[in-house]
């Protein structure tokens, strides 16, 4: 399968999309740089602000409109607004943060060798042409601030 990856939001989303790219490549999928060439588009969404929520919906709709690809949505918008995200892309194409690691298994294994098991940290050098890698230090939050969606979208830290 040819898969295009995009994200809205923070550096954590960027780190996760790069890890997702590595996981998909390990399963024999092809990551493409042109969404028009993709069979699937995966969007890692954000909802930390109302604008981020709107941007997430806008990006998803644009790919639905402008490509022939199936659009999968994951990330904070999907976690915080599960029903709306499922209505936007379909329930089977909507993955909350808790289910994000299951996305690569959704695709059949392609022509990839079985991965070797190395016992060291492999930096996620994704398709974003960055010279730096990200290491996830924390995810989520243990507080219950009334004005913040982080706990809902990301869960406990």
Predicted segments, located by residue:
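Proteins enriched for Cys/Gly/acidic motifs involved in redox and nucleic-acid/cofactor modification
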Residues: 1-157
């Amino acid at each position: 399968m040819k898969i295009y990856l995009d994200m809205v939001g923070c550096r954590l989303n960027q780190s996760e999309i790069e890890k997702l790219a590595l996981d998909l490549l390990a399963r024999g999928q092809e990551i493409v740089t042109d969404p028009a060439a993709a069979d699937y588009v995966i969007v890692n969404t954000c909802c930390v602000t109302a604008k981020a929520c709107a941007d997430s919906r806008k990006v998803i709709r644009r790919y639905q409109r402008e490509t022939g690809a199936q659009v999968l949505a994951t990330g904070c918008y999907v976690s915080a607004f599960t029903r709306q995200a499922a209505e936007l892309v379909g329930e089977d194409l909507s993955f909350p943060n808790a289910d994000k690691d299951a996305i690569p298994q959704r695709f059949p294994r392609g022509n990839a060798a079985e991965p070797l098991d190395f016992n060291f940290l492999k930096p996620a050098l994704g398709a974003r042409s960055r010279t730096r890698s990200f290491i996830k230090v924390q995810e989520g939050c243990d507080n219950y601030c009334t004005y913040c969606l982080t706990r809902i979208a990301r869960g406990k830290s």
